[in-house]
UniProtKB/Swiss-Prot annotation:
It comes from Rattus norvegicus (Rat). Residues 91-112 are annotated as: Disordered. One of its GO terms (cellular component) is cytoplasm. Residues 179-256 form the POU-specific domain. CDD domains: homeodomain (cd00086). GO terms for molecular function: DNA-binding transcription activator activity, RNA polymerase II-specific; DNA-binding transcription factor activity; DNA-binding transcription factor activity, RNA polymerase II-specific; RNA polymerase II cis-regulatory region sequence-specific DNA binding; sequence-specific DNA binding; sequence-specific double-stranded DNA binding. PANTHER family: POU DOMAIN (PTHR11636), POU DOMAIN, CLASS 4, TRANSCRIPTION FACTOR 3 (PTHR11636:SF43). Keywords: Activator, Cytoplasm, Differentiation, DNA-binding, Homeobox, Nucleus, Transcription, Transcription regulation. Interacts with ISL1. The gene is Pou4f3. It holds the Pfam family Pou. This is POU domain, class 4, transcription factor 3.
């Protein structure tokens, strides 16, 4: 009985210990499963943390380098250690990512603003030209923490502020051109030259303002006569003078080209633009015509030709005078009756 009782604990002991070892086995298996991806996850977390620290440090260095200028030369060895301690990208799980303590424990890694400013100066032109569009930045993993993206945004802003000379070469040429056009002496000389040529062409200021709409220049319509007058008298504002100068110069070139073409072919323009001049008859000829009219108010064509030859006038002038004189007599008689 005792043997049976003695066997029962030993028989039940494996049964009781089985779940215990099974639970330990499952617990260790669970712990092993949890610990296996831990380096990768931990690496990703610290990778984004390291890159965030580096991005913030570079942004602060960029702001500092703008105010203090260049104080330290560029050191390739320091650049090598700084860049080698931090991986280029956190997308590769196989590359070991160092802990942030490595930045402070290494003898070559004191956070120096002047050195980081020089490093930022050498890096940021390439990034500004490429628009930070490198493949490493274009393919970003979904596990990156949001504060990492914010730090990169601050870095982009700092790079844009610390390198105004990257845009300066492109705006240098328009600045030189605007300086030439905005010279007050040049504007004054052009206004005087424009006025003289306009008068020579026989065009009024109102005609110039109305003709500007025919140039088909975008944003330019007809202008008033007072605007052209103020331009010629230099009473417009400086900015308006600069804006109006190329428009008036374009009109002047077109008007002078049309004037030269008109002078080269006068037979095409004289027929339509010829104006009849008003004929003035001197007092002696006028008294002679009144004497002939008293004798014969309706002379024949031969008589009109003889009178014109005698008074040294054109036949058509004598004929029109007799016609006008008859109309005058009719009006006088009509007014006397009524």
């Amino acid at each position: 009985m005792m043997a049976m009782n003695a066997k029962q604990p030993f028989g039940m002991h494996p049964v009781l210990q089985e779940p215990k070892f099974s639970s330990l086995h499952s617990g260790s298996e669970a712990m092993r499963r949890v610990c296996l991806p831990a380096p990768q996850l931990q690496g990703n977390i610290f990778g984004s943390f390291d890159e965030s620290l580096l991005a913030r440090a570079e942004a602060l260095a960029a702001v500092d380098i703008v105010s203090h200028g260049k104080n330290h030369p560029f050191k390739p060895d320091a650049t090598y250690h700084t860049m080698s301690s931090v991986p280029c990208t956190s997308t590769s799980p196989t590359v070991p990512i160092s802990h942030p303590a490595a930045l402070t424990s290494h003898p070559h890694h004191p956070v120096h603003q002047g050195l980081e400013g020089d490093l930022l100066e050498h890096i940021s032109p390439t990034l500004s030209v490429s628009g930070l569009g490198a493949p490493e930045h274009s393919v970003m993993p979904a596990q990156i923490h949001p504060h990492h993206l914010g730090a990169m945004g601050h870095l982009h802003q700092a790079m844009g502020m610390s390198h105004p000379h990257a845009v300066a070469p492109h705006s240098a040429m328009p600045a030189c051109l605007s300086d030439v056009e905005s010279d007050p002496r040049e504007l004054e000389a052009f206004a005087e030259r424009f006025k003289q040529r306009r008068i020579k062409l026989g065009v009024t200021q109102a005609d110039v303002g109305a003709a500007l709409a025919n140039l088909k220049i975008p944003g330019v319509g007809s202008l008033s006569q007072s605007t052209i007058c103020r331009f010629e008298s230099l009473t417009l504002s400086h900015n308006n003078m600069i804006a109006l100068k190329p428009v008036l110069q374009a009109w002047l070139e077109e008007a002078e080209a049309a004037y030269r073409e008109k002078n080269s072919k006068p037979e095409l323009f004289n027929g339509s633009e010829r104006k009849r001049k008003r004929t003035s008859i001197a007092a002696p000829e006028k008294r002679s015509l009144e004497a002939y009219f008293a004798i014969q108010p309706r002379p024949s064509s031969e008589k009109i030709a003889a009178i014109a030859e005698k008074l040294d006038l054109k036949k058509n002038v004598v004929r029109v005078w007799f016609c006008n004189q008859r109309q005058k007599q009719k009006r006088m008689k009509y007014s006397a009756v009524h």
